[in-house]
Curated annotation (Swiss-Prot):
Record site feature (Transition state stabilizer), residues: R17
List of residues binding substrate: R17, D18, S171, H200, Y291
Gene Ontology molecular-function annotations: 2-isopropylmalate synthase activity; 4-hydroxy-2-oxovalerate aldolase activity; manganese ion binding
E.C. number: 4.1.3.39
Superkingdom, taxonomy of origin: Bacteria
EC category: lyase
Keywords from the UniProt entry: Aromatic hydrocarbons catabolism, Lyase, Manganese, Metal-binding, Plasmid
Protein's UniProt name: 4-hydroxy-2-oxovalerate aldolase
Pathway where this protein functions: Xenobiotic degradation; toluene degradation
Sequence similarity: Belongs to the 4-hydroxy-2-oxovalerate aldolase family.
Keyword Transcription part of the UniProt annotation: no
Positions annotated as active site in the UniProt record: H21 (proton acceptor)
Amino acid sequence: MTFNPGKKLYISDVTLRDGSHAIRHQYSIQNVQDIARALDKARVDSIEVTHGDGLQGSSFNYGFGAHSDLEWIEAAADVIQHARVTVLLVPGIGTVHDLKAAYDAGARSVRVATHCTEADVSRQHIEYARELGMDTVGFLMMSHMIPAEQLAAQGKLMETYGAQCIYMADSGGAMNMNDIRDRMRAFKAVLNPQTQTGMHAHHNLSLGVANSIIAVEEGCDRIDASLAGMGAGAGNAPLEVFIAAAERLGWNHGTDLYTLMDAADDIVRPLQDRPVRVDRETLGLGYAGVYSSFLRHAEVAAAKYGLKTLDILVELGRRRMVGGQEDMIVDVALDLLAARKEQQA
């Protein structure tokens, strides 16, 4: 395909959803409005707002939010004039009833997210989103875990259900530029020309921006990113960094770089109780291909049982645990503890 550098990129901010993982889902209403207002001023195309694990993610398994999804959505919608309010919905966590409530609260776009091999569970939610008239996205998580052609086939399923855009989500921050190129080409080979594609990167191997650039060069229409990289693990592709790189490449992104830079440093970074960066633990996520939002849960388990967070994460990767299996983190920690005691006996 021919790359068109003048094509308007759709910039999708995830600070208020994926970024929620970084502070254990404790955004205040004021935080949400400050961030949403700045993003809207910078003219991003969409602002995703929910618990980090999507609609109804607030739970014992994933962590309780400081507010309900609807409170966060309404708070953002009250101050946004340009961008679409977007929500994440994981079938099995959120329901179509939750989606209708989110729509009534102001959401106009939804990403229906499944594990990369489970697109078939998204049908009901995608079809209902289209009935509501929402911009509807199929979102394939942990996309590094299956080959490109298999991933594309899962995306095609979501397209047949009515998804208008198909995303590859590098939830473990484990992919490199060749992985992205292969998967984006596979998408383009099977999806209808009018179906858009999207890239959701994590920065665990410091490749979030590079991978997003490669995706665009392969025809990707939508790019996820977050202010100061605020997100699970080492964070997402930092929005202000991606936009600066896109600007230097002469791409049409439609946003104001300096407004994003100010928001990242003045509003978002001070909220981080644990720096969102590549370090021993977050690098372990990318190296082992582990779901990025496992990080904070693994840190709690490590502190409780006197283990290294990295050891827990690597074992989770070895067992090929995926999003939704947060309850297994304690099981893994107990197994590691038992193995250590056995060695010491």
